[in-house]
């Protein structure tokens, strides 16, 4: 049987490389999502003001 140090079978260097890519991709996704929400809010706010939707 092979001696594996991890359940996934990837080396520590491969895991760190994947983690760095995952974190950068997730960060980019969050930035794009926040920007989209800000633009949508500027276009059409989804919480009514003090006078309602009028």
From Swiss-Prot:
Periplasmic side: 44-54
Protein's name in the database: Light-harvesting protein B-880 beta chain
InterPro entries assigned to the protein according to its UniProt record, in alphabetical order: Antenna_a/b (IPR000066), Antenna_beta_CS (IPR023623), Antenna_beta_dom_sf (IPR023624), LHB-1/5 (IPR002362), Light-harvesting_complex (IPR035889)
Record's bilayer topology term: Single-pass type II membrane protein
Subcellular location: Cell inner membrane
Binding positions (a bacteriochlorophyll): 19, 37
NCBIfam families registered for this protein in UniProt: pufB_517_ASD
Entry keyword set: Antenna complex, Bacteriochlorophyll, Cell inner membrane, Cell membrane, Chlorophyll, Chromophore, Light-harvesting polypeptide, Magnesium, Membrane, Metal-binding, Transmembrane, Transmembrane helix
TM helices/strands, residue ranges: 21-43
Database matches in PROSITE patterns: ANTENNA_COMP_BETA (PS00969)
One family name in Pfam for this protein: LHC
SUPFAM superfamilies linked to this entry: Light-harvesting complex subunits
Primary location recorded for the protein, binned into one broad class: membrane
Its biological purpose: Antenna complexes are light-harvesting systems, which transfer the excitation energy to the reaction centers.
Provenance organism: Rhodoblastus acidophilus
Entry's Gene Ontology cellular component terms: plasma membrane; plasma membrane light-harvesting complex
Lineage: Bacteria, Pseudomonadati, Pseudomonadota, Alphaproteobacteria, Hyphomicrobiales
Gene Ontology terms, MF aspect: bacteriochlorophyll binding; electron transporter, transferring electrons within the cyclic electron transport pathway of photosynthesis activity; metal ion binding
Family in the record: Belongs to the antenna complex beta subunit family.
Gene Ontology terms describing biological process: photosynthesis, light reaction
Membrane side Cytoplasmic: residue ranges: 1-20
Assembly information from the UniProt record: The core complex is formed by different alpha and beta chains, binding bacteriochlorophyll molecules, and arranged most probably in tetrameric structures disposed around the reaction center. The non-pigmented gamma chains may constitute additional components.
């Amino acid at each position: 049987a092979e001696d594996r140090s991890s359940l996934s079978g990837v080396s520590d260097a491969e895991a760190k490389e994947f983690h760095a890519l995952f974190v950068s991709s997730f960060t980019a996704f969050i930035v794009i999502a926040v920007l989209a929400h800000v633009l949508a809010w500027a276009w059409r706010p989804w919480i009514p003001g003090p006078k309602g939707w009028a």
